[in-house]
């Protein structure tokens, strides 16, 4: 898949890594108009065999009410020589008041860091690649339009969109892990955005949109939403897009073949007009009437 073009935003050097047991944080840096930092859990976050990596907003309370940032993110782990040890996948997600940080719970298998030759001098470098795709500041004016619906804060204008989902899939939100109504509402917004996306015709989907859609789907599934129907829909879109891309490629190849044949044909025609015709001896010799000697006239 094609990746979104991300920029290296920050590099963090971590010394004496194997001796780290507790969560550690980087210095603060700026991205998307926010102060950010990287959080590492050397012994994992629910998965003891993995290193966990997160990007967090440094001082979310200093931002305007209703702030949010949509961003794409990945991390690269390097050793002291600059050799790449591991690269995470690219994720696309939302930062906001209820979700000031997110990242990768299973960013890197710890077995990779047990190799002393790979982990030189017990030192790691973490490179952070970010692209902020949306910056929003929202005030409190929409709060009065919020309604409680099935444990979620929903805008009155969204009820018509949310009701059919609960009617068709009544248990789809039964297992979600967040208990805060505000956090649940953020994920519901992600769900509604994803549903709107997958309802677009497959032929107008870009690869970037598909990457973002799958990233949103992963976020929803990780917090417990039962959204297999959305995964099936996305898989159908992905397959339809692949068939279209393959068909377009075959058509391009066919046209290229026709163009090549036409070029060769034009060359042959040009050659036949330019090259002189080879003439035989007969073509050069003019016809001569046979000479017949005259007989003398007898008197």
UniProtKB/Swiss-Prot annotation:
UniProt keywords (A-Z) are: Coiled coil
Q: Which InterPro entries match?
A: MATH-CC_domain_protein, MATH/TRAF_dom, TRAF-like
Q: Which SUPFAM superfamilies match?
A: TRAF domain-like (SSF49599)
Pfam families per UniProt: MATH_2 (PF22486)
Task: Cite the MATH domain residue spans from the record.
Answer: 7-130
Q: Which PROSITE patterns does the record cross-reference, listed alphabetically?
A: MATH (PS50144)
Coiled coil stretches, renumbered: 225-262
What protein name does the entry list? MATH domain and coiled-coil domain-containing protein At2g42460
């Amino acid at each position: 898949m094609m990746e979104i073009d991300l920029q290296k935003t920050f590099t963090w050097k971590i010394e004496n890594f194997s001796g780290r047991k507790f969560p550690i944080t980087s210095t603060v840096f700026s991205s998307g108009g926010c102060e950010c930092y990287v959080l590492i859990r050397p012994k994992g976050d629910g998965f003891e065999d993995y290193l966990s990596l997160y990007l967090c907003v440094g001082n979310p309370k200093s931002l305007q009410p209703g702030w949010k940032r949509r961003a794409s993110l990945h991390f690269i782990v390097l050793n002291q020589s600059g050799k790449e040890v591991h690269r995470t996948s690219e994720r696309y997600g939302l930062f906001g008041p209820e979700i000031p940080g997110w990242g990768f719970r299973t960013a890197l298998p710890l077995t990779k860091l047990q190799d002393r030759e790979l982990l030189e001098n017990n030192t790691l470098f973490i490179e952070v690649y970010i692209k902020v795709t949306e910056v929003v500041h929202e005030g409190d004016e929409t709060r009065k339009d919020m309604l409680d619906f099935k444990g979620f804060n929903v805008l009155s204008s969204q009820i018509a969109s949310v009701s059919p989902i609960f009617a068709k899939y009544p248990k789809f939100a039964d297992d979600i892990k967040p208990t805060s109504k505000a956090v649940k509402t953020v994920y519901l917004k992600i769900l509604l955005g994803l549903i709107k996306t997958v309802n677009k015709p497959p032929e107008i989907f870009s690869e970037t949109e598909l990457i973002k859609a799958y990233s949103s789907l992963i976020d929803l599934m990780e917090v417990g939403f039962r959204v297999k129907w959305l995964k099936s829909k996305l898989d159908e879109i992905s397959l339809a897009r692949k068939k279209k891309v393959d068909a377009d490629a075959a058509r391009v190849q066919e046209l290229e073949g026709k163009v090549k044949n036409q070029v060769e044909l034009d060359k042959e025609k040009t050659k036949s007009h330019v090259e002189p015709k080879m003439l035989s001896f007969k073509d050069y010799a003019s016809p001569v009437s046979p000479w017949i000697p005259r007989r003398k006239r007898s008197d």
